[in-house]
């Protein structure tokens, strides 16, 4: 369906977990191996870092070939891991309306500033 829309983007939103250690935290953006997806992911990663956690050193990264949707989409696509549910502090933060709003605003800002606006 998304591919039938001109100039479409796909943003898949997730929460991360890592059961081996609870210390991992921070948003991270992944992309399929396509230049436009990589550029969007890098831009979104930087906006999330600036807006949510300037100390976050995570970089946008290529997805391993294990996410069906991302392997079969032809438009630019990113997968956003908003934080780690396995980290108690981040889990608590992710559950608050204020942080969810801040996260949504950062993602919207990243998308709107990356995509050229249609001429009126």
Q: Residues of each region from the PLM?
A:
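Active-site-proximal helix/loop segments of hydrolytic enzymes
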Residues: 1-120
